[in-house]
Amino acid sequence: MSVKRSSVRGPGSGYGYSITHNSTAPTYRAASTYGGAGGQGTRISSVSYSGVRSGMGGMGVGMGGSGGSMSSSIQVSTSGDTAHIMGNEKFAMQNLNDRLASYLEMVRNLEQANGKLELKIREAMEKRGPDVNDYSRYNAILDDLRKKVFDATTDNARMCLQIDNARLAADDFRVKFESELSIRQSVEADIVGLRKVIDDTNMGRMNLESEIEALKEELIFLKKNHDNEVMEMRNMISQSGVQVDVDAPKGQDLAAIMAEVRAKYEKEALKNQEELKAWHETRITEVQSVVSQNTEALQGAHTEINDLRRQLQTLEIELDSQKSLKGSLEGTLRDTEMRYNMEMESLNKILVGLESELTNLRSNIQQQTQEYEHLLNIKMKLEAEIATYRRLLDGGDFKLQDALEDQRTVKTKVMTVTQTLVDGKVVSSSTETKERNL
């Protein structure tokens, strides 16, 4: 009859115990213990004790990672012959001593390998751990990008300000143009009125000139009529030969009377002529003064019209230049917005790339943390197997309870630290702790 229990394995490594009982003699067997880290493995062969006859199997220890292997075996059998038993025990003790020396050497090698492995794990954690991540190489790129964004924003604001200033200047020029246009229209209306006044003045002047001509003709006619009357009077006097002697006082001389009448009429005609001439000159002076005033006003109006026309042309030129400036500024604004959008897209792509890289770094950190936990688990299991092997070599009894007690629970605490970096500074940090049994 035999009872066998075996195969209790953990993740990444395996170890098992089996106990076999025979009906004739009790036999205790410690089964093989497997443990490995990477390509390394440790195997402890079974050892059996019998009440009458004992046999101790071979024990072998091998390391695949170090490229070396050792193996030794012991076969001890007892019989009724005590001397034969003592000789076998002596030989077995020598073999055990040799195997113990080999085992201790293997333990030292394993400890050195564990030390190297821990050093590599520590270096990997220092290089790629969350607290040692160095993102300073991105600070220059981010500063340059921030500077470009700030410059683009400043240029955009400057362009908007220039456009607003140009729009305000265009509005001012439009108001000024409208006011100048109203002034021009009022001046043109005044010019039309002045032209009417000039036409009326010309008509009055022509009427006065016609009146003067009529008066001159009337004066000539009066002079001619007067001369004719004088000639007729003289002829009548010369032709009349009648001489009347009157016994009366001597009257006035007719020639003297005629001379007096002639002088009187000539004086009145001269007076009328002078008055007419003075009145004509006065009217002409008044008309000339009015005409000169109207001419000066007309010349001033023409000058003002020319000035207004020049100002209008200047304003139209400035308006065209402002329109062209506005068009160029709008084109520059569109180009700036397009360039700004392109830069923002490139920055977003860079940001997405950095975020993906950060995600990859975090996943690598998590993966290495899991690998570290796995290696730590393997190390602890190796230490447990070494302790069990030492206890077996020291001659301690091996029981099923001891094998089961070796299967102690190992709890692993995983601490995840999440940090948010802005401008190379930590703005938020969160810690998540998880415990699990190994």
Swiss-Prot record:
InterPro entries: IF_conserved, IF_rod_dom, Keratin_I. Residues 258-395 are annotated as: Coil 2. Pfam families: Filament (PF00038). Gene3D superfamilies: 1.20.5.170, Single helix bin, Vasodilator-stimulated phosphoprotein. GO terms for cellular component: keratin filament. One of its GO terms (molecular function) is structural molecule activity. The keyword DNA repair does not apply. Keywords: Coiled coil, Intermediate filament, Keratin, Phosphoprotein. The record marks 279, 340 as: Stutter. Residues 234-257 are annotated as: Linker 12. Expressed in all tissues examined, including epidermal keratinocytes, tongue mucosa, corneal epithelium, Meninges cells, epidermal goblet and Merkel cells, gill mucosa, basal cells of gill secondary lamellae, hepatocytes and bile canaliculi, bile duct, intestinal mucosa, blood vessel endothelial and muscle cells, interstitial cells, fibroblasts, scale-associated cells, ovary stroma and follicle, optic nerve glia, eye ciliary body, chondrocytes and kidney tubules. Residues 1-21 are annotated as: Disordered. Residues 396-438 are annotated as: Tail. Residues 89-124 are annotated as: Coil 1A. Residues 89-400 form the IF rod domain. Residues 125-141 are annotated as: Linker 1. Residues 142-233 are annotated as: Coil 1B. When phosphorylated, plays a role in filament reorganization. This is Keratin, type I cytoskeletal 18. It comes from Oncorhynchus mykiss.
